[in-house]
From Swiss-Prot:
Official protein name in the record: Ribosomal RNA small subunit methyltransferase H
Function in brief: Specifically methylates the N4 position of cytidine in position 1402 (C1402) of 16S rRNA.
GO biological process: rRNA base methylation
Protein source organism: Corynebacterium efficiens (strain DSM 44549 / YS-314 / AJ 12310 / JCM 11189 / NBRC 100395)
Pfam families, alphabetized: Methyltransf_5
Binding site for S-adenosyl-L-methionine: 45-47, 64, 91, 120, 127
SUPFAM superfamilies per UniProt: Putative methyltransferase TM0872, insert domain (SSF81799), S-adenosyl-L-methionine-dependent methyltransferases (SSF53335)
Superkingdom assignment: Bacteria
Source organism phylogeny: Bacteria, Bacillati, Actinomycetota, Actinomycetes, Mycobacteriales
Enzyme class, spelled out: transferase
Length: 338
C-alpha cells in the first residue's frame, strides 16, 4: 500500500483496497466497458479511485449522503471523466437512483446490471477527522453526528428529547452498553439543568457514570455511547436492511456485492441475509432442489474475512473490519469458493 499513504490520500487510506478489487475483479474484467461498479459509501473516494485505476474500462457510480464528500471525491476523480458519476443519496436510495437517475452510466447499469458493489459501512475516516461533525469523543465539538449535515436529528436532539427508555434502548441495542439504563438516568438528570450541546459534557457524564473498574478495562468509556448515538442519528441499520435486497436484485449474473462491517450488529445483519439468500427453499429430505427453489446466490467468502496484520499496521482503522461477499449465479453451484 505504499502508493496510498495517509498524507497523499486525502487523510483516508481505503481499507483492504486490493482485496476489495480482487473480490469483484474476474467478472468486472469479463464485462469490460459494460461493467458498472457501485461504490455505495463513496466517502473520500479511495476505493472508487482504485477501482477506476485497476479496471480501466469499468464505470463507477459513487453514492454518498454528504455533499462535502461528493464534492471532494468528485474533484479527486475528475481525471476519470465520464467513467465516474457521483450521486447524493443515502445508500438505500440505490434502487431509486437505478430506476430514475439520468446519465450514460445509469443507462448502462439499467441495461447490463451491476457487476460489482462495495458497502464500506459506518462513519468514514474523512468524517471522523472533521472535528466539527461531532463523531469523535476525544475532542470537544457540537453533538451533531449527522452524515448528511443538512437534515435529520442530531445526537444532541436525542439526548435532549428522547425518553429514558428510548435512550437506554439506543445505547443497549446499538452500543452493547452494559450501563445503558444508568447512563440514561444521568442524561435525564443533567438535561434538566441545561440541554446537551457539546461532546465534552457528555464524555464527562460518562466518566462519572461508568464504574471505575469498567473504565480501566473496557476501553474509552464514551466509545459505545458515541457509536450508538451515531447509528441512531443516521438510521444506519435501517439503511442497511433496506439496501441488502436492493443490491442483490440489481446484480447481473456473476456480479458480486461486498460488505465491510465494523460493528457486530452490522455483520450479523449481513450474515443473516446472505444465509437466507444462499439457502435452498426445497423442503428437507429431498435429494435435489425443486424447480424455482435453488438458491440464486452463493457466498464468496468463507465466513467473514478480516484484515491482515500488515494491513492493520499500515491502517489501524482496518482492525475491526469483517468482510462478506455474495455473488449472483445462474443456477445452483457450490456455496463457497475455494
Amino acid at each position: 500500500m505504499d502508493d496510498y499513504s495517509i498524507a497523499g490520500n486525502h487523510g483516508h487510506v481505503p481499507v483492504m483496497r486490493d482485496r476489495m478489487a480482487a473480490l469483484i475483479a474476474d467478472h468486472v474484467r469479463e464485462m469490460g466497458d459494460r461493467a458498472v461498479i457501485v461504490d455505495a459509501t463513496l466517502g473520500a473516494g479511495g476505493h472508487a479511485e482504485h477501482f477506476l485505476t485497476v479496471f480501466p474500462e469499468a464505470h463507477v457510480i459513487g453514492l454518498d449522503r454528504d455533499e462535502n464528500a461528493l464534492r471532494d471525491a468528485g474533484e479527486r476523480l475528475a481525471r476519470f471523466g465520464d467513467r465516474f458519476l457521483g450521486v447524493k443519496t443515502r445508500f438505500d436510495g440505490l434502487s431509486q437512483v437505478l430506476a430514475t437517475g439520468e446519465g450514460d452510466i445509469l443507462d448502462l447499469a439499467r441495461k447490463e446490471g451491476i457487476s460489482g458493489a462495495l458497502f464500506d459501512l459506518g462513519v468514514s475516516s474523512m468524517q471522523l477527522d472533521q472535528v466539527e461533525r461531532g463523531f469523535a469523543y476525544r475532542t470537544d465539538a457540537p453533538l451533531d453526528m449527522r452524515m448528511d449535515p443538512t437534515q435529520g436529528i442530531t445526537a444532541a436532539d436525542i439526548l435532549n428529547t428522547y425518553s429514558h427508555g428510548d435512550i437506554a434502548r439506543v445505547l443497549k441495542t446499538y452500543g452493547d452498553e452494559r450501563f445503558a439504563g444508568k447512563i440514561a438516568s444521568a442524561v435525564l438528570k443533567e438535561r434538566e439543568k441545561e440541554p446537551f450541546t457539546t461532546s465534552a459534557r457528555l464524555v464527562e457524564l460518562l466518566y462519572d457514570t461508568i464504574p471505575a473498574a469498567t473504565r480501566r478495562t473496557g476501553g474509552h468509556p464514551a466509545k459505545r455511547t458515541f457509536q450508538a448515538l451515531r447509528v441512531e442519528v443516521n438510521r444506519e441499520l435501517e439503511s442497511l436492511s433496506n439496501v441488502l435486497p436492493q443490491i442483490t436484485d440489481a446484480l447481473n449474473v456473476g456480479g458480486r456485492a461486498v460488505f465491510m462491517s465494523y460493528q457486530s450488529h452490522e455483520d450479523k445483519l449481513v450474515k443473516r441475509f446472505f444465509t437466507e439468500l444462499t439457502t435452498s427453499k426445497t423442503p428437507p429430505g429431498l435429494p435435489v432442489d425443486l424447480p424455482g427453489t435453488a438458491p440464486r446466490f452463493r457466498q464468496v467468502t468463507r465466513g467473514a474475512e478480516t484484515a491482515s496484520e500488515a494491513e492493520i499496521e499500515e491502517n489501524p482503522r482496518a482492525a475491526p473490519v469483517k468482510v462478506r461477499a455474495i455473488e449472483r449465479i445462474a443456477e445452483h453451484t457450490e456455496n463457497t469458493e475455494n
